[in-house]
Amino acid sequence: VNFVSGIKSCITVPDDLKDGLFMAEEYISGQEYSIESISFNDRHDIIQITEKVTTGAPHFVELEHHQPAHLSPSIEKKIRNIIPPILSSVNFSNGASHIEIKVNDQGDVYLIEVNPRGGGDYISNDLVSLSTDYDYLKQMILVALGEYNPVAVHHVAYAGIYFLSAYTKRLLPYFNIPLANWMVRRERKTGELTVSSSNYDRDGFIIYCSDKKIVL
């Protein structure tokens, strides 16, 4: 995968690959979000919206997740209105889903990908249960058992996660102080910090929960 922003960043294709297939896609700029949903018998319930921070091109390593996302009422309404039709259009009927989108400065919403699973990076198994009164994992099991009944979801706190890597070395002091009251959990690998090129080579994390968004 190559990120091309102009003529100077174009690449030369080797002769032995010139008969191959290539795909060029527009790069969508804007703020990234993920929508955590659950579906049962073609009904789609949005549980939470996660605001995401990444390294950007070319690797888009995820550095932060925050719930609930900071959105204007109109943008949140737009997101909540488009997600059910997206899931229905791909015939997704039952189970958890994790949908990634971007919203540009004009308020346009772009679909990035649809995942037929709960969100990783502690989104499904930690952040949702911290930021809402909704037991996401329990509801996934009830869907599998055919016993799911929709329940109201209420915002109860701000929750998020910061990932440690060479990109976020500013976080290091928070691993060397006593556990603060807003810290739910923290872990760190030993050794030098990694210049991460994927979500699989980060060096640690801090999960928080508070009555406000924690900015580190």
Label for each model-derived stretch:
Residues 26-32, 36-92, 96, 115-144:
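ATP-dependent carboxylate/phosphate-activation module, predominantly the ATP-grasp catalytic core
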Residues 1-2:
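Conserved anion/nucleotide-ligand pocket segment
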Residues 39-43, 103-107, 166-167:
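Short acidic-glycine loop/turn motifs at beta-strand connectors
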Residues 93-105:
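A short glycine-rich, hydrophobically flanked beta-strand micro-motif that places a catalytic Asp/Glu
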Residues 19:
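His/Asp/Glu-rich metal-coordinating catalytic cores
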Residues 139-216:
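Peripheral (often C-terminal) accessory segments that flank ATP-dependent C-N-forming ligase machineries
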